[in-house]
Swiss-Prot record:
Family to which the UniProt record says this protein belongs: Belongs to the cytochrome P450 family.
Gene3D superfamilies in the cross-refs: Cytochrome P450 (1.10.630.10)
Keyword Nucleotide-binding: no
Descriptive protein name: Cytochrome P450 monooxygenase pkfB
Gene name as annotated: pkfkB
UniProt-listed GO biological process terms: secondary metabolite biosynthetic process
Source organism of this protein record: Emericella nidulans (strain FGSC A4 / ATCC 38163 / CBS 112.46 / NRRL 194 / M139) (Aspergillus nidulans)
Broad enzyme group: oxidoreductase
Binding-site list for heme: 450
């Protein structure tokens, strides 16, 4: 009697295992597909997250997302369990002020990972109790009443920028990239607010110690993993990966840790002066001590100030100036409003001088709307009981999200010209303006709204009048202006020439 050859048996077993694996995969894909089959979207996005990863890798995900919404409507399936939303009236439901609608694993990838594990931060924390513990003690520091006394720090940094522009460029007719200098300003402002000292970007006219490049590389590297967070756990955020490749975010935390350690040593030695006592790091340390919180809280708070606080303000500053220079009529209207505002504080207009100027407000709102710093959907997990938006039901566990880039261009809300710069859209009735402001998702919404939004507005309403009144900028080639989106939005190529205006020369 013949017996089956062992190799034949092995081959048969292998074929069975392959068939079982394929059957399991087919059942899984069908199950995933059917769960949200009532929601339209690209075919491959219904069964895999790989299209989302590809979109992010192109650096044009924001434009792809907008095109998909134009094709499929307000509700589009971006992944097997991820749905993108566009209608601004749904913002209060997706981002409520109450607890219960949690952030997705998207944010886990944005937390810097150290040899001791991931560092929780106000922005990236998904656990609502952890978030409340981090945000609660410092929330009052970011209220407008607490932010306004920091105006003196902004003025000092404006003064440094002005001296650099006057000394390097205004008299020489030399071309320079205004985008870079606005980023230098934004980072030095946050350095001054946080540590009572600038990083030195403005004085040196360069990326000091590669800080800006380090932060950008961290964000750019994390962006694709936001679409497939489980891969990030395998590839980056575990003990083995840390030993082999080094921990993600360590270089940024090293910068933060250096400043924090230096301040702690100065405090112990009694070397803190009255100015330093007013900066945010000193306040963070005082809050941590008074509330008996772990020391890493100070690091987490400071990390958020340095990264999100600086880069996001720089994006909006560049948007304001690029569009003012590209649309001279709006620049002239803004300058006329500033010159007609009455006696202005010298050498730079104060917050009180400009806080209620309608066209300045319109230009800043339009910049916040047109180019938000964050251009991927803010993801949330549908809670128990599901969620209904319009006539669409979303089962529990579905990930939903709204992209500021897409929502801020909602034509029924902002007009048919929502893709272009038009500050006049804000020079409307109080009711319509309020409706549109509520639809701008740039700072997020609900209980996770951006803590630093008042600081950003203070910076913008200080730097824009100061530069518009003092200088005439000539944009060399508007076509050289480029953008890229890796979660954070970045603009480059704002080559300009600058000269002082006659009124500035006369001290008016």
């Amino acid at each position: 009697m013949d017996h089956p050859h062992p190799s034949t048996f092995s081959l048969g077993l292998s074929q069975i295992l392959v068939c079982l694996a394929l059957l399991y995969a087919a059942i899984h894909i069908l199950s995933v597909y059917r769960r949200l089959c009532h929601i339209s979207g690209p075919f491959w996005a219904r069964i895999s997250n790989l299209p989302r990863v590809w979109w992010v890798n192109t650096s044009r995900a924001h434009e792809i997302h907008q095109q998909l919404h134009e094709k499929y409507g307000d509700v589009v399936r971006f992944g097997p369990n991820m749905v993108s939303l566009r209608n601004p009236t749904w913002i209060p439901t997706v981002y409520p002020t109450r607890m219960g609608v949690k952030k997705s694993d998207f944010y886990r990838t944005l937390a810097p990972y150290t040899p001791s594990g991931a560092l929780p931060a106000v922005f990236s924390s998904r656990d609502e109790e952890v978030h409340r513990g981090l945000r609660g003690p410092i929330a009052s520091l970011y209220s407008m009443s607490k932010v306004l006394p920091l105006e003196v720090f902004v003025d000092r940094t404006i003064d440094v920028l002005v001296r650099q522009l006057d000394g390097r460029f205004a008299g020489a007719g030399e071309t320079f990239d205004l985008a870079s200098w606005l980023q230098f300003f934004a980072f030095d402002v946050m350095g001054t607010l946080t540590f009572s000292k600038r990083y030195g970007f403005l004085e040196k006219g360069m990326d000091v110690h590669g800080m800006l490049d380090t932060i950008w590389r961290f964000l750019k590297g994390a962006a694709p993993f936001t679409q497939i967070p489980w891969v990030d756990e395998i590839w980056n955020k575990n003990v083995l990966a840390t030993k082999l490749k080094g921990a993600t975010g360590v270089s940024i935390l090293g910068i933060v840790g250096k400043f924090v350690s230096q301040r702690q040593e100065e405090s112990k030695a009694g070397k803190i002066d009255g100015t330093a006592d007013r900066d945010m790091l000193s306040l963070f340390m005082e809050i941590q001590k008074n509330n008996q919180l772990p020391p890493w809280y100070v690091t987490a708070w400071t990390f958020s100030n340095i990264t999100a606080g600086s880069d996001s303000a720089a994006v909006v500053m560049r948007t304001v100036f690029y569009n003012l220079l590209s649309h001279p009529s709006t620049l002239q209207k803004l300058r006329s409003e500033l010159l007609s505002a009455g006696p202005l504080t010298q050498p730079y207009p104060s917050w009180k001088d400009v806080c209620n100027l309608p066209y300045l407000d319109a230009c800043i709102l339009e910049a916040l709307r047109l180019h938000p710093p964050f251009c991927l959907p803010f993801e949330r997990i549908v809670p128990q009981g599901g969620m209904v938006l319009g006539d669409t039901y979303f089962p529990e566990g579905t990930v939903v999200g709204m992209s500021p880039w897409v929502v801020n261009r909602h034509k029924p809300t902002f007009g048919e010209d929502s893709d272009v710069w038009n500050p006049e859209r804000w020079m409307v009735s109080k009711e319509l303006k309020s409706k549109r402001e509520a639809a701008v998702l740039t700072f997020g919404a609900g209980r996770r709204v951006c803590l630093g939004r008042h600081i950003a507005i203070l910076e913008l309403k200080k730097i824009v009048p100061a530069l518009v009144l003092r200088y005439d900028f000539e944009l060399i080639d508007p076509e050289r202006f480029t953008t890229e989106n890796f979660w954070f939005f970045r603009q480059r190529g704002m080559d300009v020439r600058v000269k002082k205006r006659m009124q500035a020369e006369a001290g008016i």
